[in-house]
Every structure is written in C-alpha cells, then in structure tokens.
Amino acid sequence: MSKVITEEEIRKDVEEKNVRFLRLAFTDINGTLKNLEVPVSQLDDVLGNQTRFDGSSIDGFVRLEESDMVLYPDLATWLVLAWTTVEEGTIGRLVCSVHNVDGTPFEGDPRNNLKKVIAEMEEMGFSDFEIGFEAEFFLFKEGKNGEETTKVSDHSSYFDMASEDEGAKCRREIVETLEKLGFRVEAAHHEVGDGQQEIDFRFDNALATADKLQTFKMVVKTIARKYHLHASFMAKPVEGLAGNGMHTNMSLLKDGKNAFYDKDGQYNLSTTALTFLNGILEHARAITCVANPTVNSYKRLIPGFEAPVYISWASRNRSPMVRIPNANEVGTRLEMRSTDPTANPYLLLSACLKAGLTGIKEGKLPMAPVTSNLFEMTDDERKELGIKPLPSTLHNAIKAFKEDEVVKSAFSEHIVDSFLELKETEWALYTQSVSEWEVKRYFNY
C-alpha cells in the first residue's frame, strides 16, 4: 500500500515547496528516533547514498574505532514537515537505513533487521506482513518554566466527549497534521486514564507501519509542545492510572489475499493464522523482552488495569494476551494486547514475525481459546488450562529472551549482544536505585 516516490518527484517538491533542509531519520536499538539534518545543497549526496555520520555515539551501533556509517534513504518515506512553511523555508524528511562504508547493510540497524526477516517471510510464499498499531499516550502540563511534570491535561475518561481544553485541541491538531503528512487517521479519542489519548492510523506493511509509528511519535510530541504540553509514551507514567499500551494488529498476505482468513475456520481463522498464533504464544515470554523493553513496562502488566498478564488467546474476551477482533475477510487479524509504545517497532515486528513463521513451519495448533475472565480465575484454574503468566519484571523477560533460540534468531548477533548489554545495564541500575516509595516506607526503621 505504500506509494512509490521517485527522485524526480522529490526534486520537484524541493523546488516548489522551498525545502531548505533535509532531515535524515533513523532509529537506534532502543527505538529512539535519531536525525541528521543537512542543507538542501546536499540533496545529490543524500539521494546518491553518500551521507556519512559517526555511529560511535549511537546506542547499539559501533565502537569509536569503526565509527563511519552511511545513510541510505528510503524514497517512499519522503515528506515535507507540515509545521514548516514555504515562506520561511520547509524541511524535508526521509527515513533511512544504515549501511557500512563498503555499502553493505549494517547488521546493528533495527530497520535492516526487519527487512531481513521480511525476506524470510517472502521465501515462504507470503507477500506482506500487515500491521496496525494502536499507540496510547498521555498529555501532561508544562511547569512554569517549561519543565516536564506529571500533571495531566484533563480529568476525562474513555470516549468522553472532548471538552474545549488544551488536550482536546492538541489532539485535533495532531490528527490534522498527520493527515497532511499522508496518514489515514481512522479514529481519535480520549482513553481510560486522565489526560490519556489514542489516535489510530490505517494499517500498512510492516516496514511502512514501523516507519509511520516513529513519525507519529515525532508529530505527537511536536504538536504537544505548541500547547505547552508534554506527550509521553512511557508505559506507566502515573501510579494508579491506566498505562500506555500499543495493541499490535497482525496479518499475513498471500497472493494479495489475507492468509489468516478462512470462512469455515474457528472465528474465521485459517490454519495459517492458528499456527502463526501458536508461534506467538509459545515464544511470548521472550517476545515480551522487546515488546515491553523497560523496567517501567512491568508496572503496566499487572491485574486491574486491562493490560494482559497471561499467555492465552480469545475472541471477544479482552483479558488474554492475544485477541481475535470480529472482522471481515480483509480485516481478519491477531491483536497482541501486551505491547507498549516504548517498544522499538522494528525489533518488535522482527520478533513477532519470526515466532509466527516458526509456528507455521511447525504446524502446531494453539491451546483452546479462553472464554472466561482470566483475572477472576484461580491459579489452579489457570494451571489446569495450561495458561502461563507473562514475565513480571524486565529481569525475568531478559532471562526468557536469553533462553529462546527462535526469538534470538530473529536478530543479528550484533543486535542480540547490544540489546542484552543495554537491558542488563538498565536492570542493574534499577536495582541500585532507591525510590521515594522505599524511603517513605523504611526511613524510620
């Protein structure tokens, strides 16, 4: 579904829209969007894959002694940032993959990694891995000096009628900006938590959707600042409020048709869908390390706030990890509900696709779907059904990741080593940190 854009079209845009700078975007191993901005006079070098940068200071990239890297722009990602004006000069943006100086794809680049797993999918006869993200975020008020706070922008709740506060106005402008950038926005509404929002955009192939998520986050944060608000995609920014989730909708295409659909199957699911689902469930604990990659992620994965805690699946029931939404042939999909928006989208989709394809190869069907509320079951009832919990801490998720050869095989050795080093360091720093809760509870011992 992604459109094809030529060099000629980009050059025409540059001329007609008075583009003065080019922003070259790429993503580090943590999922953080990075940018190199160059004057438009460098357009020939940019389009000729000649833009170099120092990768030694980027998390998960290279050491100082081998720091030179090259940015290869994906022309299909070209856009002109909607908040820049022709009169003052606009900024063009291209998403890039990272290459070594000899022209080979850099194995530590998360985007290159996803392309490699997609190639494996194509070798199995599938044409597309279609993804739809539902990323939630909070809007917080700025402090007097522009500092970040955790004071929510409003006290509304799920689907509440938008009041004319700054949060509602901000959300509307985010939607308008996304549409100017070519997004097909399908819905925008207030979420469960105070100050919490959700904006859903149309699904696309995996690479395009991962690129769009990074653009989406940039737009949300940029527009929020105009309203003196801070946008946060942190999994659990406020104790006692719902956390930010990122439901991840997945389907495979084959010969232009949805390979997950079978009108005679249970919930209209094909054998391909069921075996893919089994791959996700069997490797769920390891996938969690990339789907919920921060210490804070596990403050969201607790009973009582709708986020799933148990490895299971269902149709209408929203308590399991994977749900099958009621949909037509085109919309038949798996909805993974455990993910949060701190996940690196390229690594997340690499892990999910690899696990699902492995499930298809193995041909095993998943456990029976769960019809009861998992949170109301006893431990014995869940055990009898073979339902296991997701990891409860980043430490447990790291352990599961290390032990899962299938999920590790979704990534280059460079990414596995770099990711584990970063996550183990993060956990070690957390265990050494003394929280306000601890001080209040134990200070007078």
Swiss-Prot record:
Would the keyword Cytoplasm be found if you checked this record's keyword annotation?
Answer: yes
Which keywords does this Swiss-Prot/TrEMBL entry list? ATP-binding, Cytoplasm, Ligase, Magnesium, Metal-binding, Nucleotide-binding
Instruction: Identify the EC number(s).
Output: 6.3.1.2
> What is the superkingdom listed in this entry's lineage?
Bacteria
**What is one Gene Ontology biological process annotated in the Swiss-Prot or TrEMBL record?**
glutamine biosynthetic process
Q: What is its main location?
A: cytoplasm
Give the family, as the similarity comment puts it.
Answer: Belongs to the glutamine synthetase family.
Q: What does the entry's cofactor note say about binding and number?
A: Binds 2 Mg(2+) ions per subunit.
Q: Supply the InterPro entries for this chain.
A: Gln_synt_N, Gln_synt_N_sf, Gln_synth/guanido_kin_cat_dom, Gln_synth_cat_dom, Gln_synth_gly_rich_site, Gln_synth_I, Gln_synth_N_conserv_site
Q: Which reaction does it catalyse?
A: L-glutamate + NH4(+) + ATP = L-glutamine + ADP + phosphate + H(+)
> What is the recorded function of this protein according to its Swiss-Prot or TrEMBL entry?
Glutamine synthetase (GS) is an unusual multitasking protein that functions as an enzyme, a transcription coregulator, and a chaperone in ammonium assimilation and in the regulation of genes involved in nitrogen metabolism. It catalyzes the ATP-dependent biosynthesis of glutamine from glutamate and ammonia. Feedback-inhibited GlnA also interacts with and regulates the activity of the transcriptional regulator TnrA. During nitrogen limitation, TnrA is in its DNA-binding active state and turns on the transcription of genes required for nitrogen assimilation.
Enumerate the Gene3D superfamilies for this protein: Glutamine synthetase, N-terminal domain (3.10.20.70), Glutamine synthetase/guanido kinase, catalytic domain (3.30.590.10)
Q: How is its activity regulated?
A: Inhibited by glutamine.
Upper classification of the organism: Bacteria, Bacillati, Bacillota, Bacilli, Lactobacillales
Subunit relationships: Oligomer of 12 subunits arranged in the form of two hexagons. In its feedback-inhibited form, interacts with TnrA in order to block its DNA-binding activity.
Q: Where does ATP bind?
A: E186, S251, R318, R323
* Protein name (Swiss-Prot/TrEMBL): Glutamine synthetase
Provide the GS beta-grasp domain boundaries. Answer: 17-103
Record's subcellular location: Cytoplasm
Positions binding L-glutamate in this chain are: G243, R300, E306, R318, R337
Q: Where is this site: Important for inhibition by glutamine?
A: R63
Binding residues for Mg(2+) 2: E136, E191, E198
The GS catalytic domain covers which part of the protein? 110-445
Ligase listed as a keyword: yes
Any idea which positions bind Mg(2+) 1? E134, H247, E335
